[in-house]
Amino acid sequence: MQVLHVCSEMFPLLKTGGLADVIGALPAAQIAEGIDTRVLLPAFPDIRRGVVDAQVVTRRDTFAGRITLLYGHFNGVGIYLIDAPHLYDRPGSPYHDTNQHAYTDNVLRFALLGWVGSEMASGLDPFWRPDVVHAHDWHAGLTPAYLAARGRPAKSVFTVHNLAYQGMFYSWHMNDIELPWSFYNMHGLEFNGQISFLKAGLYYADHITAVSPTYAREITEPQYAYGMEGLLRQRHHEGRLSGILNGVDDGIWSPQNDLLLPMRYDRDTLEEKAENKRQLQIAMGLKVDDKAPLFAVVSRLTSQKGLDLVLEALPGLLEQGGQLALLGAGDPVLQEGFLAAAAEHPGKVGVQIGYHEAFSHRIMGGADVILVPSRFEPCGLTQLYGLKYGTLPLVRRTGGLADTVSDSSLENLADGLATGFVFEDSNALSLLRAIRRAFVLWSRPSLWRYVQRQAMNMDFSWQVAANSYRELYQRLM
């Protein structure tokens, strides 16, 4: 079986979010399962530099201009690159300029990605043709539409990593992207009077997956579906919507092998984690105190991630003797709020604005609790890293967070199921109650250690996900 992933980023070549982590790990896991898997990406500068052995496959004139299709390898995975400097050779973000404005030609840049994905199933590379084309998020959303226009030369899977980003463009761009105007209607890619790349993926794909079973259920409800609930409910009834949980790349996230940690450890040497905490406290300007539970945030600072709730609950966390270490960037109001808290509570609150992959490992290895209070969370990887590192996740019961973290309730503790702390309602009071439960468990060190070991024992490997995708592909064939 031959599978092509169509997407816009891949860790470690280029990363703006969790999508990159998935594409950095899933194809390799599928190859290990015996599936001939390759990836198609735009040749953004960082990606182009990283694929050093790229050779020309073919050149084509397209609706978006002249392109060269390249093929090379990265970390043992075959990579196709769409080399179109006039579209992709731009510094910084792949999606917007330095003023955070979306590029005005994004409609062409990402329509081309979908078009090439479809053409691969029609022999664009004469030596390799996919049986399944697996597109990810709105950037690749037109892929199933182009396949449908082509008479479906391959089966298509569309994975929703985040339904909030819908890839909306003016309707007149139908003239620019070489799809029939008949596709522009409510039973197609039209949404609220515009073209939606996301809806194209949802409507035309043979099967839709969400990145967790709970999120797959949630997106059939209005509060999570951003207007797509009717279509998603229909796909659910047709048996064409399912949830497959993301995994963790053990090669990158593993406390016993993590070279970015001052001190490596495993579930049998958890006492070594204390040195990581000490060094993290020093690095973040916090008081060195092994008795104070260290809560951490590694996140985009947005209301979706519930970081306003953390700011609201922070006085209660500090009053009980806790510390906070935060790494992230985003909403300027939230950034200012956390910086002000750090200034007001020196030694108790440490804040680094920005994102540094290496430092996120040090936080995960040194903190006691990782906070993930999201209003919605399709899968979430942060809590999975927390589980791996014995850094107990404190999460809201939504999406993938609900599927992966079990609350330290008395029943779960008695049954050996507890792996963290879970709260229900998206408000600061509910969050504070969970923080209070974390302090109660912290006051019982042997019980805390027991829950850490339970957490570290969980298996969220990519092999599990790769096997689930293989079963799905086989059902479609």
Curated annotation (Swiss-Prot):
Keywords: Glycogen biosynthesis, Glycosyltransferase, Transferase. SUPFAM superfamilies: UDP-Glycosyltransferase/glycogen phosphorylase. Pfam families: Glyco_transf_5 (PF08323), Glycos_transf_1 (PF00534). GO terms for biological process: glycogen biosynthetic process. It catalyses: [(1->4)-alpha-D-glucosyl](n) + ADP-alpha-D-glucose = [(1->4)-alpha-D-glucosyl](n+1) + ADP + H(+). The keyword Transferase applies. One of its GO terms (molecular function) is alpha-1,4-glucan glucosyltransferase (ADP-glucose donor) activity. Pathway: Glycan biosynthesis; glycogen biosynthesis. GO terms for cellular component: cytosol. Synthesizes alpha-1,4-glucan chains using ADP-glucose. This is Glycogen synthase. The gene is glgA.
